[in-house]
Amino acid sequence: MSELKERLLPPRPASAINLRGDAGSRPSPSGRQPLLGVDVLGLKKRGQGLKSWIRVDTSANSQVIEVDKFTMMRRCDLPARDLRLLDPLFVYPSTILGREKAIVVNLEQIRCIITADEVLLLNSLDNYVLRYVVELQQRLKASSVTEVWNQDSLELSRRRSRSLDNVLQNSSPDYLPFEFRALEVALEAACTFLDSQASELEIEAYPLLDELTSKISTLNLERARRLKSRLVALTRRVQKVRDEIEQLMDDDGDMAEMYLTEKKKRMEGSLYGDQSLPVYRTNDCFSLSAPVSPVSSPPESRRLEKSLSIVRSRHDSARSSEDATENIEELEMLLEAYFVVIDSTLNKLTSLKEYIDDTEDFINIQLDNVRNQLIQFELLLTTATFVVAIFGVVAGIFGMNFEIDFFEKPGAFKWVLAITGVCGLVVFLAFLWYYKRRRLMPL
């Protein structure tokens, strides 16, 4: 037991061992046990909790960084409970959380933090994590090439176009922001992983169930029990992913919260707007963005400035609401696509569960049939035993020790045996006729 504790617990610092030895060698004058020394620096180093993270930026560049928990919390503006979702030592259900500056994704093996500029994953040797990183880099590189091509075509169309409408129509390329592309790869990886597990379970289940219907054995029943346990666990995981996607699709506020690029642009725009200094007055007119003094300005100018500010604020709010609606529609279409995929996987597992239930019902019917046959055979044996008991009664009566003249006749034994046999046969046939009439036995 002591050896196991030494292997599990971290090694003691040398300073603590030295202090303990010194304290043990010098007893206290009051007779009390001396206080043991504590290596504060060693505790501080162990308390930092540096973890290795894989960072993927918008340019598809990846690097390994070592960051502690508190630095990561400040960097992504996340609470500690969200970081616990990413810890591989704990088992949490699938979750997608939209925060102020990040999206926390916990989908099967894919556990990452998505921001507007980067994706952070715990450094792991899991193949699914490495495949996610490679697939994300390929998607980002492909999207960057597409954006360059769209910009070139946009510049060419601007040069050739003569109207302003054509320029406005071609000035907004249709592509997903960085966080949605990273979320899409995570959803695709999770859905593909769950669908592959469901397919493997189907390949293993259907032949086993078909064999079980024809041959019921202890080995096949044990395999079917294990298969059903795996099916229930996989169905629970698929159902959780489906419910999480459906919950996001039903809540427009959560979907709007996940649009990190737009929030970052608005924040930067507000900062730039606060830092800019407007020109207040020219020679004979005033600027619309200049503050109007209530003393020096006439009432007409104040009313005009107030009406213009109201119109401008309404226009900005309407434009932001339209952008939010469009962004929600983009994310909703993305989630809806993978909702269909995960719902198809769930339907596949549901069909397999129904097939298992049908097989169980068929096996129960077979067992009931065998049980009924055994009961019928037992009833037949009981009837035959009753008929044989009649012979025992006759033998007991004639076996009594008293004088009868019937015993002295030479053909008496044959007559007794024949009459008893005929009576027993009649009784047995009467029982069979009764069983057939009551449909207790198929005869």
Curated annotation (Swiss-Prot):
Function summary: High-affinity magnesium transporter that mediates the influx of magnesium. Involved in tolerance to Aluminum.
This protein's record includes keyword Ion transport: yes
Record keyword Ion transport present: yes
Parts of the chain that traverse the membrane: 379-399, 415-435
Motif Required for magnesium transport activity boundaries: 399-401
A GO term from the CC aspect: plasma membrane
Membrane topology: Multi-pass membrane protein
Listed name of the protein: Magnesium transporter MRS2-10
Domain of life: Eukaryota
Other comment: Has the ability to complement mutants in Salmonella enterica and yeast lacking magnesium transport capability.
UniProt-annotated location(s): Cell membrane
UniProt keywords, alphabetically: Cell membrane, Ion transport, Magnesium, Membrane, Transmembrane, Transmembrane helix, Transport
MF terms in GO: magnesium ion transmembrane transporter activity
InterPro entries reported in the protein's UniProt record: CorA_TM1_TM2, MRS2-like
UniProt main location, coarse: membrane
